[in-house]
Amino acid sequence: MTSIAVIGSGNIGATIGEAWRRAGHEVAFASRSPAPPETLGIGDAIAGAEVVLLAIPGGGVPDLLAEHGAALDGRVVIDATNDVAGERLHHAEAYPSAPGARFARAFNTLGFEMFADPSIGGETADLLWCGPDDAGVERLIADVGLRPIRVGGIDAIDVVDGACRLWLTLVFSQGHPRRLAFKMLTD
């Protein structure tokens, strides 16, 4: 069992957090404006966590890390945010505000609907991610029901975000349904 703080109370954080609870993990939900009794303040949630999932609007990442960076020391931080209005989808330039954290990029390339029901036509969806290969992230992705595909260390963040841009284009520009996923096939 892993203790996890889910920062963000929207569809992505709630759906992933509930999947982790069903898998047996201890999950605390946090937001800037906690609504007791279920939601904690961000600092309180981080204090009791080994892993932190960032599931807030992407533009808020720099401020959150500036305020809570020291508290993230020694923790794995999974960045699931997307700043769709920004120049880039991620804010990795803010990661140095939490120098003791180990960052991974995951859960940002599919719609939250795939985290609630991770298969289509009997096929399990793949989730591309990057970050440290020894941080337990693959297990947490599998615990949501997805097949993890690691594309490298955190320096591969733009590769992962390329898959996100593809998903956004297919869904929002081409009109495909949000329950759209990717599958890597090999021979």
Predicted features along the sequence, with ranges:
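NAD(P)+-binding Rossmann beta1-loop-alpha1 motif at the extreme N-terminus of oxidoreductases
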Residues: 1-41
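Residues at the starts of beta-strands that form the adenosine-phosphate
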Residues: 3, 26, 50, 126, ...
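Rossmann-like NAD(P)-binding element
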Residues: 42-76, 80-83
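Short, conserved loop/helix-junction motifs that constitute active-site signature segments
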Residues: 67-74, 97-99, 121-122
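Rossmann-fold NAD(P)-binding glycine/threonine-rich loop
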Residues: 81-120
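Active-site-lining helix/loop region of Rossmann-like oxidoreductase modules
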Residues: 126-187
